[in-house]
Curated annotation (Swiss-Prot):
The modification Phosphoserine is found at residue 540. InterPro entries: GOST_TM, GPR107/GPR108-like, TMEM87A/B_GOLD. The lineage of its organism: Eukaryota, Metazoa, Chordata, Craniata, Vertebrata. Keywords: Cell membrane, Cell projection, Disulfide bond, Glycoprotein, Golgi apparatus, Membrane, Phosphoprotein, Signal, Transmembrane, Transmembrane helix. It comes from Mus musculus. This is Transmembrane protein 87A.
Length: 555
């Protein structure tokens, strides 16, 4: 739980930190991973012997569950039993495991430790042909019965419960009675006939098809809000792209490399959201997911987050702002980005494919440690870069860093509040009754990231003054002054300098005293909230040398 919470807050810290000079970095750090819509249509081959099928979903009221059977004729007798149960707590279906079906059914019959209501019915078929003819259940239909001490209330209200009839046809749909989490279980008991050979005992006798359809076709109540959210996010990213293209077209001659990367991150985010929305639409109308589309979406998300973190590190190091090149540090940046791409891609693919669940959970651990190390690296680099900008007294670049750092502080505070809220509401409660709001746990982080991306776009928007953010080393100015000095001497050679009388008015002393006062204020008084928020870090020998070099040039 702690690892998952850190994975949610660390991307916010990470993106916000580095995205200051480089807006597109923000989008790359994705929040909590997306869990794509679950399928609502299954084709299950049923072998000889006893078999179970189950699913747990949050369903709309009047959602229909349709059972279909198809296969070759057989002489085996079949006993088909189904259970449909609603739950008051989402934990009951979330923690339900397939290998616990038999014990769960025993508790259901004994009404032990369960909540909600349930329906059940059973029918014996003499052979497969009888099953394929859509025979009906009769006599074994059980009314919905409340659990957990609500027997008396159920008896009083039993006469008010209405059904479509005394018999339910096997191929007729079952129907839910309220918006709630549901568990559906089908038990197929198959007895081999005496005439059938033993070697065919394990062969697939028939195929059972289960379909779940509600007001929005195959889309369930837990997936419908996320589909709407991804549709809105697609529109938002399209607007971001149009706005960025318009700015870039107006000032295309003065575009910086950073602004090209911002456009690339916007495009990746738009593409990622479109793939997820298309997957939800496919589930809605076909009931089955396209696994390749899910894998593509997860890989796009991993590339986007890795690119964002790499760019944030580069910008926090001052590349293009106070340094013309990174030198040997560039290799460290590339390795960090490659490692994050590897771990995030592995975790996403394992999660959406449903294979190796334990490995997918373990993939969170290296991601958490890597995010921690990268955040610490960004904090140190960002502090050093802001110190150099203060020494150079570059007000424009320093203001850019401060504005985004203030945004960072607010976003980190908001992320902490959201983590506390989601933990208290969804994770540590014994009965998760607010299942209607589960989609917010994923959507809130993506919404927060989009807001930060918009702030980055505003700070780094293309304009006529783009070059004010470009790297301008002080050494070039010194070289120009040195080249101008001998030319001035030759121009005025042979001319006499008139002596000027020094006026002892004390002006020089006053100016020197003012400079000393300003220097003391600059060194001892923090100039903004960012100086207080970012802790003072010990200067290394290399930092002292750089600081001394910058001061000597200014003097």
């Amino acid at each position: 739980m702690a690892v998952a919470a850190w994975l949610q807050v660390s991307p916010v810290i990470f993106l916000l930190l580095g995205a200051q000079p480089f807006p597109l970095s923000f989008l790359g750090a994705g929040p909590a991973p997306v869990f794509a819509a679950d399928r609502s249509k299954w084709h299950i081959p049923m072998p000889s012997g006893k078999g179970y099928f189950n699913f747990g979903k949050i369903l709309f009221r009047n959602t229909t569950i349709l059972l279909k059977f198809d296969g070759e004729p057989c002489d085996q007798s079949l006993n088909i039993t189904w259970f449909l149960k609603s739950a008051d707590c989402y934990n009951e279906i979330y923690n339900f495991k397939a290998d616990e079906i038999e014990s769960y059914l025993e508790n259901l019959k004994g009404k032990k430790g369960l909540s909600g209501r349930y329906q059940t019915s059973s029918r014996l078929f003499q052979n497969c042909s009888e099953l394929y003819k859509a025979q009906s259940f009769s006599g074994d239909f059980t009314h919905r019965l409340p659990l957990l001490g609500e027997k008396q209330e159920a008896k009083e209200n039993a006469t008010n419960v209405t059904f479509t009839g005394d018999k339910i046809a096997m191929h007729e749909p079952l129907q839910t009675w309220q918006d709630a989490p549901y568990i559906f279980i089908v038990h197929v008991g198959i007895s081999s006939s005496k005439e059938s050979p033993k070697e065919n005992a394990l062969s697939n006798l028939f195929t059972m098809t289960v379909e779940v359809k509600g007001p929005y076709e195959y889309l369930t109540l837990e997936d419908y809000p996320l589909m709407i959210f991804f549709m809105v996010m697609c529109i938002v990213y399209v607007l971001f792209g149009v706005l960025w293209l318009a700015w870039s077209a107006c000032y295309w001659r003065d575009l910086l490399r950073i602004q090209f990367w911002i456009g690339a991150v916007i495009f990746l985010g738009m593409f990622e959201k479109a793939v997820f929305y298309a997957e939800f639409q496919n589930i809605r109308y076909k009931g089955e997911s396209v696994q390749n589309a899910l894998v593509l979406a997860e890989l796009l998300s991993a590339v986007k987050r890795s690119l964002a973190r790499t760019l944030v590190i580069i910008v926090s190091l001052g590349y293009g702002i106070v340094k013309p090149r990174l030198g040997v540090t560039l290799h460290k940046v590339v390795v960090a980005g490659a490692l994050y791409l590897l771990f995030s891609g592995m975790e996403g693919v394992l999660r959406v494919t449903g294979a190796q669940t334990d490995l997918a959970s373990l993939a969170f651990i290296p991601l958490a440690f890597l995010d921690t190390a990268l955040c610490w690296w960004i904090f140190i680099s960002l502090t050093q870069t802001m110190k150099l900008l203060k020494l150079r007294r570059n007000i424009v670049k320093l203001s850019l860093y401060r504005h985004f750092t203030n945004t960072l502080i607010l976003a980190v505070a908001a992320s902490i509040v959201f983590i506390i809220w989601t933990t208290m509401k969804f994770r540590i409660v014994t009965c998760q009754s607010d299942w209607r709001e589960l989609w917010v746990d994923d959507a809130i982080w993506r919404l927060l990231f989009s807001m930060i991306l918009f702030v980055i776009m505003i700070l780094w928007r293309p304009s006529a003054n783009n070059q004010r953010f470009a790297f301008s080393p002080l050494s070039e100015e010194d070289e120009e002054d040195e080249q101008k000095e001998p030319m001035l001497k030759e121009s005025f050679e042979g001319m006499k300098m008139r002596s000027t009388k020094q006026e002892p008015n004390g002006t020089s002393k006053v100016n020197k005293a003012q400079e000393d006062d300003l220097k003391w204020v600059e060194e001892n008084v923090p100039s903004s909230v960012t100086d207080v928020a970012l802790p003072a870090l010990l200067d290394s020998d290399e930092e002292r040398m750089i600081t001394h070099f910058e001061r000597s040039k200014m003097e």
